[in-house]
């Protein structure tokens, strides 16, 4: 797993809390949630949960996918799997020799 390399590549500034759960989630293989401060309203950290059982993608690809959502949050790109997501998915696939960070028809807009 190249978690720190992915974070550095994306230029993430906020901490990433990665949780791996060894059970299946019927809705998604992974999920991203931004955590904001109650006092200041500013982004505090990124919460990523990987539900790692019988997945269609490998662990590195799932983590890269969710980290792109973290990048979107830090850079205020309010889209789910739009233009910016696809651009960074392609960049990460090329840089780290990953496949299917974004899957058309699976990753919904």
State each model region's role.
Residues 1-61, 70-109:
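Active-site-proximal or metal-binding-adjacent scaffold patches in catalytic folds
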Residues 66:
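Walker B catalytic acidic pair
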